[in-house]
Regions:
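Active-site microenvironment of metallo-dependent hydrolases
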Residues: 3-99
């Protein structure tokens, strides 16, 4: 299958799971969006760009919005630092318990 076919199937499956019948981006509609870094897209366009992205051949995800909220900016999760800090605290606690 092509990237376009896989993307379309995932898109339709998501619509079905959410009970959404609207097509495309519209005011008030639920939206999860991905912005790719054009510099890593190797001048691909259309189907070729989608194939490159779906099959993971070097296209960098630059920004992501979930439910309209930006969760990835410049390739990094917006709460990455907080999550890493919380992880370190929990890891230290677990290691202390093992000693």
């Amino acid at each position: 299958p092509t990237g376009t076919a896989l993307y379309t199937a995932a898109y339709r499956g998501g619509q079905q799971a959410l009970g959404v019948v609207a097509e495309g981006i519209a005011t008030g509609a639920p939206a999860d969006l991905v912005a790719l870094d054009a510099a890593t897209a190797d001048a691909a366009d259309g189907d070729r760009l989608l194939n490159t992205w779906v099959f993971g051949q070097g296209v960098t995800v630059n920004r992501v919005w979930v439910g309209g909220d930006e969760v990835v900016r410049d390739g990094r999760h917006v709460h990455r630092d907080e999550a890493a800090s919380a992880y370190r605290v929990v890891l230290r606690s677990l290691l202390d318990e093992l000693r």
